[in-house]
Curated annotation (Swiss-Prot):
Pfam families: UPF0231. Belongs to the UPF0231 family. InterPro entries: UPF0231. This is UPF0231 protein Ent638_0667. It comes from Enterobacter sp. (strain 638). It comes from the Bacteria. The lineage of its organism: Bacteria, Pseudomonadati, Pseudomonadota, Gammaproteobacteria, Enterobacterales.
Length: 120
């Protein structure tokens, strides 16, 4: 899972992820938006559920983050739309709407994001 951090012209941090993990970058860009308290919450949840059968979920405005002791799932909330609501011939490009990755890999991105934020 490759990633890149960039600053836009306003100084805001943007995350770009490798193919297949784009939605993780969207989660950082749309839900985190430099809110380190949210990252604290995610890291605390990861510590709490590690080695257990429990899971944790955070539903955001655009994306939902779900994790258990082994993997993290990020999915666009729009995926809740049933097929009946879609126009004929239309479908979602799911690669940018859903992603799975390991908890440790995800936490590495969180750590790198924090470090990049401190470089202001």
């Amino acid at each position: 899972m490759d990633y890149e951090f960039l600053r836009d012209i306003t100084g805001g941090v943007k995350v770009r992820m490798s193919m297949g993990h784009e939605v993780v970058g969207h989660w950082f860009n749309e839900e985190v938006k430099e809110n380190l308290a949210l990252l604290d919450e995610v890291e605390q949840a990861a510590r709490t559920i590690k080695g257990s059968e429990r899971s944790w979920q955070r539903i955001g405005h655009e994306y939902t983050l779900w994790m258990d002791g082994e993997e993290v799932m990020v999915r666009a909330n729009q995926m809740e739309i049933s097929g009946d609501e879609m126009e004929e011939g239309m479908s979602y490009y799911d690669e940018e709407s859903f992603s799975l990755c390991g908890v440790e890999d995800f936490l590495q991105v969180v750590k790198a994001y924090r470090e990049f934020m401190q470089q202001k």
